[in-house]
């Protein structure tokens, strides 16, 4: 069971927008990107295609940047997503 803490749909940002959370966030974070972004995952900066999604566990480092205007959906949620 999990609880949605905050959510935004089709949220706009300016070109160059970045999130840099070296220690992550205290909640799960789900992101859906309408356009291409660069995501740091497993130590590598990777260009993700439009409509890519990523789910971060609490405390997982988060970094992404959009070189163009960005539109994205995001959800912060807490709880146990294991289903156990």
Describe each region flagged by the PLM.
Residues 1-49, 60, 66-69, 80-83:
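Generic protein-terminus/edge-of-domain signal
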Residues 75:
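Glycine/small-residue-rich loop that forms an oxyanion/phosphate-binding "nest" at active or ligand-binding sites
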């Amino acid at each position: 069971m999990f609880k949605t803490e905050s959510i935004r749909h089709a949220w706009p940002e300016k070109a160059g927008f970045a999130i840099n959370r070296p220690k992550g966030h205290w909640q799960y974070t789900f992101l859906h990107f309408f356009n291409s972004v660069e995501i740091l995952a497993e130590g590598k900066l990777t260009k993700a295609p439009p409509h890519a999604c990523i789910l971060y566990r609490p405390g997982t480092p988060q970094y992404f940047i959009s070189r163009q205007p960005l539109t994205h959906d995001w959800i912060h949620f807490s709880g146990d997503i294991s289903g156990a």
